[in-house]
């Protein structure tokens, strides 16, 4: 790792769990932190120094990190109230250079390191792989009527999915589409990062962005960025009749699926956690679910390891 830092002309490297859409719950194939440390938890970044590699995990993953990390990696176990970046900063010398992958951190997070010497990297030296994503075709709901005062660049995938009505059910535990969007009277949807970058480079006017969700890379391309916290969250809180009916239908289906799983547990013998997960998937899909919203958290005998992989041991 010393040679890598020397080659990049930096003293430290921040290694992220997020991908280029700033999504933490992404495939391990594009998770640089997993590539470096072997830790498969959904959150937590790593820091490479000239002497050590540090992995930062919250209370959900203290035991799992010890079980999974590669040798010679120091696990920093965050306690309640501790913030990851605060602990990272304690390991930094402000006079030395921290390398940050511009496409994998938000502009807001980058600015939180003000006062430290930063070198932005265009590509990830640990894992620069990016999964391919399909062009969205499924319209789950009608598009929303959202008319901002000025041209707005939206980078939050949940918000893009909400405004367009598009959904992508090809990925596990996700229905959001992988796209960015500009609204300037018309709606311009970018499913290709290169096309989006070219648009940002050539756009000469003011562009409203949310620093909490735009990557530092995209932000640097914009000539006249105006930061404004997204108001789409408030818009999402007002449900249409169609959305309310969809919720009611989903709640009813969930009740039926969970009652069936409960009956399975009560009546079957010699089953494992993995058996129950398979049954849960079956019952939800039987009720019409396209997929599960998140990986099941199911524990019978290892309650302290809620987020680790399910066991096949019979119970």
What are the residue ranges of the model-derived segments?
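Short coil/turn segments at secondary-structure boundaries
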Residues: 17, 154-157, 260-263, 292-297
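N-terminal accessory/capping or targeting/presequence segment of soluble
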Residues: 1-90, 105, 109-203, 307-310, ...
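Phosphate/diphosphate-binding loops
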Residues: 211-213, 289, 304-315
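Extended, domain-scale alpha-helical bundle/helix-rich regions
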Residues: 81-116, 121-147, 172, 208-224, ...
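Short, basic/aromatic beta-hairpin or loop at an interaction surface
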Residues: 22-26, 291-305
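Short beta-strand/loop turn elements enriched in aromatics
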Residues: 10-15, 20, 281-295
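N-terminal glycine-rich flavin-associated loop
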Residues: 260-268, 302-307
């Amino acid at each position: 790792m010393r040679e890598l830092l020397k080659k990049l002309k930096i003293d430290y490297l921040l290694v992220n769990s997020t991908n280029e859409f700033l999504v933490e719950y992404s495939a391990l194939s594009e998770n640089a932190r997993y590539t470096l440390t072997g830790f498969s938890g959904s959150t937590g970044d790593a820091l490479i120094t000239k002497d050590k590699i540090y992995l930062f995990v919250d209370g959900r993953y203290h035991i799992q990190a010890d079980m999974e990390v590669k040798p010679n990696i120091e696990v920093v176990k965050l306690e309640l109230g501790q913030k990851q970046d605060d602990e990272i900063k304690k390991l930094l010398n402000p006079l030395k250079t921290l390398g940050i992958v511009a496409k994998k951190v938000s502009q807001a997070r980058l600015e939180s390191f003000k006062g430290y010497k930063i070198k932005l990297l265009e590509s990830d030296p640990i894992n620069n792989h990016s999964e391919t994503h399909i062009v969205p075709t499924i319209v789950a709901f009608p598009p929303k009527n959202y008319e901002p005062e000025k041209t707005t660049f939206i980078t939050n995938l949940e918000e893009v999915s909400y405004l367009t009505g598009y959904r992508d059910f090809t990925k596990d535990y996700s229905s959001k589409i992988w796209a960015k969007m500009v609204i300037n009277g018309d709606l311009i949807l970018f499913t290709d990062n290169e096309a989006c970058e070219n648009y940002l480079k050539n756009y000469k006017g003011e562009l409203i962005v949310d620093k909490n969700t735009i990557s530092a890379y995209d932000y640097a391309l914009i000539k006249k960025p105006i930061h404004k916290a997204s108001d789409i969250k408030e818009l999402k809180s007002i449900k249409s009749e169609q959305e309310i009916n969809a919720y009611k239908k989903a709640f009813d289906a969930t009740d039926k699926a969970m009652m069936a799983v409960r009956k399975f547990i009560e009546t079957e013998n010699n089953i494992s956690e993995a058996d129950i997960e398979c049954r849960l998937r079956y019952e939800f899909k039987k009720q019409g679910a396209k997929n599960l919203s998140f990986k099941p958290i199911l524990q019978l005998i290892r309650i302290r390891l809620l987020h680790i992989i399910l066991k096949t041991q019979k119970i």
